């Protein structure tokens, strides 16, 4: 009898014991570890209201002199440390923040620390980054961490690109392609430090 089930469905039902044979009965099957499931965070629909790419276009048309900064995340090994890239479009300069993981809590924490560090040197985050454009990654779902200062007052406008529309923020995408010339896809960042990121970021803009 021909099995008409998709491959993934067949494997799943096999592992659940729906067939007369078990993984232990297959010499090759026991060599492979089950794949880990990595749940990803998502951005609530309420957070996207008034912050979609169409809204961004309207905002920049009304405020053409406000410089934009593009945000994105470079992933190393899945589940490991990541790099959040910050590209200043007008000056064509990219910096990076080294994060322990790709979660909204970690991203919000690092942005908060950056704001405090800037304030300690007499700088205001909103003056340097008044406008942000990022993708739909769940790590950017804590909107207030990016938009508000320590007093809870808005200092920055954050907007999201449309899903699967990397071309809407082309500068970071171009830099990430060059970044991969230095650090190949799927290479772990766990041995990196912030100093490593500081060295790589300018190199990936050559």
Named regions from a protein language model:
Residues 81, 142-145, 171:
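Short, well-ordered secondary-structure micro-motifs
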Residues 72, 123-142, 162-164:
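Acidic/histidine-rich, metal-coordinating catalytic segments
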Residues 76-79, 96-122:
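Active-site beta-loop-alpha junctions of metal-dependent nucleic acid enzymes
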Residues 2-61:
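Basic, flexible linker segments flanking DNA-binding modules
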Residues 1, 9, 72, 92, ...:
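Short, conserved catalytic/metal-binding motifs centered on acidic residues
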Residues 59-69:
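Structured nucleic-acid-interacting core domains from mobile-element enzymes and related host factors
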Residues 1, 149-151, 155-206:
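Charged alpha-helix within mobile-element recombinases
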Residues 61, 72-74, 79-95, 111:
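Short conserved beta-strand segments at catalytic cores or DNA/RNA-binding microdomains
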């Amino acid at each position: 009898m021909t099995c008409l089930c998709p491959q993934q469905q067949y494997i799943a039902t096999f592992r659940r014991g729906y067939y007369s044979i078990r993984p232990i009965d297959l010499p090759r099957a026991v060599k492979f570890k089950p794949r880990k499931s990595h749940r990803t965070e998502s951005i609530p629909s309420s957070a996207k209201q008034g912050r979609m790419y169409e809204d961004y276009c309207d905002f920049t048309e009304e405020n053409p002199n406000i410089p934009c900064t593009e945000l994105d995340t470079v992933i190393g090994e899945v589940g490991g440390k990541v790099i959040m890239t910050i590209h200043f479009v007008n000056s064509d300069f990219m910096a990076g923040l080294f994060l322990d993981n790709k979660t909204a809590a970690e991203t919000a924490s690092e942005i908060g620390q950056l704001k405090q560090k800037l304030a300690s040197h007499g700088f205001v985050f909103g003056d340097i980054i008044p406008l942000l454009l990022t993708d739909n990654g769940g790590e950017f779902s804590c909107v207030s961490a990016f938009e508000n200062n320590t007093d809870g007052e808005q200092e920055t406008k954050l907007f999201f690109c449309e899903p699967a529309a990397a071309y809407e923020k082309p500068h970071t995408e171009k830099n990430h392609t060059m970044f991969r010339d230095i650090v190949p896809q799927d290479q772990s960042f766990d041995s990196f430090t912030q100093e490593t990121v500081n060295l790589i970021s300018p190199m990936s803009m050559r």
